[in-house]
Amino acid sequence: SLVGSEMCIRDRALFHDSLSDLNAHLDKEELVLFPYIYEMVKAKLENTPLPEFHCGSIEAPISVMMAEHDIEGERYRHIEHLTNGYTAPEDACNSYRLVLQQLKAFEEALHQHIHLENNIVFPRSIKMEAKLREQP
């Protein structure tokens, strides 16, 4: 239907923006944050001094990551609202139904990723850095 096709174009644009932002986000994690976490773990295991970090404290990039997580959470709440809870209209084609199903699965996986980082990885990393900074 025309409505379904207009919805598909709108949803596709929102998802495309999300993927673009998430790619940049993942690059920051993979190139900046996670290598430093690795260095912290290595320093802890080898009982060596904490290496210098160009961002100062790990809290700086973590606060950026968490703000970006919040932005994505808002974006997917908006997508969920626009798609009526990822529910296709009665007259929607099967392709659009499949897109919504996959979009919902993606959102759930993203939500899990955000939960693990915000509630486990980031707090533990901040604590580890603080303990390592206390060592002589």
Where are these predicted regions, by residue range?
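Short amphipathic alpha-helical surface micro-motifs
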Residues: L2, F15-H16, L103-K104
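Long amphipathic all-alpha helical oligomerization modules
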Residues: I37-Y38, K42-P136
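Long, amphipathic alpha-helical coupling/dimerization segments that relay conformational signals between
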Residues: R10-L22, L26
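Short, structured motif recognition centered on aromatic/hydrophobic residues
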Residues: L22, L33, V121
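Short, small-residue-biased leader/transition segments that mark boundaries at the very start
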Residues: L2-C8
